[in-house]
Amino acid sequence: MHTIQVITLFPNTILVTHHEHVEVWHILPGNKENETKISLSLFTKEKAITKSEKNHWDNNFNLAIDVVLEEDFPLGEDVQKGFYADPSRKLIFGKNEPGLQHFHKSINQALKEG
């Protein structure tokens, strides 16, 4: 069994650790309102030498991008639409998840200091 671990490094980096590789995602503000720039780096345990190995990692890289663009982002947009559907509603997010609470406290603190 393989485990995928997602680690958020405040404020804008996400590490996704797989059995044989690590993805490093950087999320930065774009030049316009509501624009974001995202970069992805993929690091493998072993250097890809053969054409087959290079194709394998190129395919993994493209798969990661496709999943984020075609699945994760649309899902996130739909969730946000739901949040805005009833702005008077109280929302409890991560009540029993200290990691999420700490992350949001860190964001709030950084915004106060900025």
Predicted regions and their residues:
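C-terminal catalytic domain of Rieske-type non-heme iron oxygenases
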Residues: 1-114
